[in-house]
């Protein structure tokens, strides 16, 4: 990108962009929902397609001059269907939350009962939190994980489903480190006559690479973000069976959105093309290898993890025996140039603004090229920061030495 063009018009924004790039280069990024896009994806986001209004769908627009953005959207849709083996795809959602909203609007009515994963147990705001539209428009009931194992309690899911008879069951999570049994969810949904929706936002890249079971054969509707493990632009997408295609498309436009962001849809198309390659599959394998290496190194050093490890790209540190809260550790790590987020753990005695846990993920560090031995180094730094308030300078030195080996966006600015 040419930062000087921006600087001539708006030096304050240019300065903010430049400093953010420096931050990304000089910190170890362990937020599980973040990643670094390819230059091709980034360039597509800054393309002239940003100028084009295109309400509607390809070949059914409410504006003229859409012949080339139609090509971009068709490519995105076809690539996404191929990636996950879906019958229908909608690539217009501006975010994962918008994708979820459209799915709800398509399948159920206000006031209907929905069964979703408890936010405190690893679910998402849009899975029924009372502070979110989902918990205000619909009657959500929740399931969670077993206190003794940290795994989803599928027997509880079935009991709650039989008791409340939901119209829709939502599977998927934002902080769950284990494989999700979509087949079991389908069986439970069928027993109570419910639709099954899967939110695979966090694991979409792993699913695309065959490293996590694919929800598409089991779910009526699947939603996702296009960033996170998929490594695309910030946005959402919806996959569904053909019988729900018309309802999904109508719920998205005109139901919940107006004009789509065509520059973002083009970037999604680029991302999906990248995800169809063998290189992407190998990259996803490295994400999981790094996650397991980081998790094992933390546990070997006495740190408890929710569920005792990970099957995917993320893990939850249970800090209750360390004398430090999630909020405190997030701050301490940020001070030594490691970025993460505090996160509630199941049955957390502390509030969501403090928490007894921290969530870590490996997509971004894997994108930089880091390997399992680097995860051991990162784990050792984290444990020393937890146990010694005076370790800050040594930790910063170790972080800087590690990052020197893995430059990021060297030619960007």
UniProtKB/Swiss-Prot annotation:
Enzyme's top EC category: transferase
CDD domains per UniProt: SHMT
Catalyzed chemical reaction(s): (6R)-5,10-methylene-5,6,7,8-tetrahydrofolate + glycine + H2O = (6S)-5,6,7,8-tetrahydrofolate + L-serine
InterPro entries associated with the record: PyrdxlP-dep_Trfase, PyrdxlP-dep_Trfase_major, PyrdxlP-dep_Trfase_small, Ser_HO-MeTrfase, Ser_HO-MeTrfase-like, Ser_HO-MeTrfase_PLP_BS, SHMT-like_dom
Subcellular location, record wording: Cytoplasm
Keywords: Amino-acid biosynthesis, Cytoplasm, One-carbon metabolism, Pyridoxal phosphate, Transferase
Residues modified as N6-(pyridoxal phosphate)lysine: 228
Cofactor(s) named in the record: pyridoxal 5'-phosphate
Positions that bind (6S)-5,6,7,8-tetrahydrofolate: 119, 123-125, 243
SUPFAM superfamilies named in the record: PLP-dependent transferases
Site annotation Plays an important role in substrate specificity: residues: 227
Subunit record text: Homodimer.
Described purpose of this protein according to its UniProt entry: Catalyzes the reversible interconversion of serine and glycine with tetrahydrofolate (THF) serving as the one-carbon carrier. This reaction serves as the major source of one-carbon groups required for the biosynthesis of purines, thymidylate, methionine, and other important biomolecules. Also exhibits THF-independent aldolase activity toward beta-hydroxyamino acids, producing glycine and aldehydes, via a retro-aldol mechanism.
Entries under HAMAP family matching the protein: SHMT
Protein name stated in the entry: Serine hydroxymethyltransferase
